[in-house]
Amino acid sequence: MANTQAMTTSFKVDLFNAVHAFNATGIPAHTVSTADQFKAALFTAASTLNASTTSFTGATTEVSGAGYSTGGVVVTFGTAPSSTGTTSFLTPSASIVYSTVTLSVSFDAMLLYNNTNTGKNSVAVYTFTAQTVAAGTFTLTMPVNDATTGLLRIA
């Protein structure tokens, strides 16, 4: 099996239940004008992350190595979700950067998840060409925040 890129099914259900707060302008039931903290964790090429991955807690085979913190890095959402036509979209406002890491086991997936939520609910799985890093920086550059290329899109 392999990692498969997808917006997770559990995230779609979470949207109806107002589980996630991507910015401080919305007030879901679990917060009071406070944005949740989202994180991006890297997973090995031997993982099987996909649309059915419900949480960070339930995912296995996260990478490990010098300079890498379990759970990954914080993702910055500096702009509010938006929409154009029939598509809503949201993209982190900065690249996702893992600085000065050594990751010798091949990895090819990133799990975006809600670190504020007790269950560490998943949002999406993103895949890329398998990588290793030797005492370097691994950067995931974010696309333009629009209805065509935004990182999270719902049409």
Predicted regions and their residues:
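Small cysteine-rich, disulfide-bonded extracellular modules of the LU/uPAR three-finger superfamily
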Residues: M1-D108, N115-A155
